[in-house]
């Protein structure tokens, strides 16, 4: 039983490390993407701050990466503690499991929502909005748009990984409630 728990903690640690790396890569790729082009004799620079949804994505992805790194430290601690044979207090581990579940859900929803919002803003930059007389920006800033597209893929992969982690957190919560715990005596 202890060996199975240790392998679960290790698997969670690997997945958290992957999510942290994906979210950090998405944040860095969005945050550091710039391109300068000359348009009608005027030099224009495209940055992440030009589209507020991209700025929000960069901040949310950075926060998600930090959260996953903190949870990864928790996995290392629990892996050492469970591997050493120590058994944490049942009530405090139940509260910790609930806290991790709620934080994982919040991180998954936030990462997914900001990535989708940034993707929606990028569709307007890709196709333009003729009714509003907005031109296609990706024809001008091709490299910038390609970098943003890459960061959107990384952000979505991080969101999917976080959703899988929240399912594992839910399983961890329900493990604390055995069928005999609340049976009528």
UniProtKB/Swiss-Prot annotation:
Keyword set includes Transmembrane: yes
Gene source species:
Sorghum bicolor (Sorghum)
Q: Which residues cross the membrane?
A: 13-33, 53-73, 106-126, 148-168
> Quaternary structure per UniProt?
Homodimer and heterodimers.
The segments annotated as topological domain Cytoplasmic are: 1-12, 74-105, 169-185
InterPro entries found in the cross-reference section: CASP/CASPL (IPR006459), CASP_dom (IPR006702)
Q: Where in the cell is it found?
A: Cell membrane
The name this protein carries in UniProt is CASP-like protein 2C1
Classify the protein's membrane topology as the record does: Multi-pass membrane protein
Q: Which UniProt keywords apply?
A: Cell membrane, Membrane, Transmembrane, Transmembrane helix
The family line of this record is: Belongs to the Casparian strip membrane proteins (CASP) family.
| Pfam families to which the protein is assigned, alphabetical | CASP_dom (PF04535)
GO cellular component: a single term: plasma membrane
